A protein has these predicted regions:
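Bacterial N-terminal signal peptides that target proteins for export
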Residues: 1-8
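Bacterial N-terminal signal peptides
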Residues: 8-16
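Predominantly soluble domains enriched in secretory-pathway, periplasmic, or organellar proteins
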Residues: 16-320
Length: 320
């Protein structure tokens, strides 16, 4: 009987350990540098660049896949997508496009890569198994940020010049709804439960908080010329880059109040939250650096020099 009790206790302990979050996770940031056509790979725990990868001309957008061990970089002037193997941090494929890619996102099922073609007003859907099969849908002028629901069935597109969000059914690749927001929406993020979509509206200095069930929209003022947004799912706060006053606004989603305004490098653009370190990383176009914010204190913790004109537009953090 004692042996049975011991085995039961041991089994329970083993199960608890197996289900606990890993303390050995390592996160890496892939920062596109539009001015020198490179990507800086940052070891977040070490706060240093471990490799600089040459990509196509004028890289802007970034998306990563843990399952595929890939980072995808949109090269707006090169009219291509650079595919980086994140195990070796080397470019293994270049996908040629007849267009000008900016926003980019991979579906959670890892089967489809979506690309916003800035000047052709369309979204491209690329099969990640061969990078050859492409579908497309016209959305609106200047499509920018992209977000995809966790079931990979819904794609949200920030349509900058029509001041709305296009909702796309990914199976048919057709627009099913348009959600009016503020002036010139650009960056997007989506909550893990898919119920809250957040749009950053550049020209009226706001973010729109969208209920994806009712499509009710709340509006919150932020800093000057906001650009991108990241969500901290641990405490439901969002971080918004304000490009013209060199700050990040920290906003509580429940109260819709600003908790802090953090000074960062010049012209902050791309921003992502790293769950492994509980840090927020901000790419500064005007200062060629990444600012690291401690999400526990909302204080600036470190800065990391990167390449020329860092943008990192998209979900740029990969955790192994």
């Amino acid at each position: 009987m004692n042996n049975l009790k011991f085995m039961a206790a041991f089994s329970l302990l083993f199960a608890l350990i197996a289900c606990a979050p890993s303390k050995n996770q390592t996160s890496f940031a892939y920062i596109s540098n539009q001015g020198d056509h490179t990507v800086s790979v940052i070891d977040i725990a070490e706060s240093k660049v471990i490799k600089t990868v040459n990509v196509g001309k004028a890289p802007v957008g970034v998306t990563v896949s843990n399952a595929l061990n890939r980072a995808f970089i949109s090269n707006v002037e090169g009219q291509s997508i650079s595919v980086i193997d994140t195990n070796t941090n080397a470019v293994i494929e270049t996908i040629a496009l007849k267009g000008d890619p900016v926003g980019i996102a991979i579906a959670p099922d890892n089967k489809t890569l979506y690309v916003a073609d800035w000047f052709s007003d369309r979204i491209l859907a690329i099969d990640t198994s061969n990078y050859k099969s492409q579908r497309e849908v016209i959305v609106a002028k200047a499509p920018a940020g992209l977000m995809i629901s966790t079931d990979s069935k819904t794609l949200y597109v920030a349509a900058r010049d029509t001041n709305d969000i296009a909702v796309i059914d990914t199976a048919s690749l057709s627009v099913t709804k348009r959600i009016p927001v503020g002036k010139h929406p650009f960056g997007l993020t989506l909550s893990a439960d898919n119920k809250t979509l957040i749009s950053v509206n550049v020209y009226d200095n706001t973010v729109s908080i969208i209920n994806t069930d009712s499509f009710k929209v709340d509006t919150i003022k932020v800093g000057e010329h906001p650009y991108c947004v990241a969500l901290n799912p641990n405490n439901q706060t969002i971080y918004v880059t304000n490009t013209q006053d060199d700050t990040v606004s920290v906003i509580d989603l429940a109260s819709k109040k600003t908790l802090a305004t953090i000074d960062v490098g010049m012209t902050p653009e791309g921003i992502s939250f790293d769950a492994a370190s509980n840090h927020v990383l901000v790419a500064s176009w005007g200062q060629n650096q990444v600012s690291v914010i401690d999400a526990n204190t909302n204080k600036l913790k470190a800065t990391i020099k990167t390449g020329d004109k860092s943008r990192a537009f998209g979900q740029f953090i990969l955790t192994k």
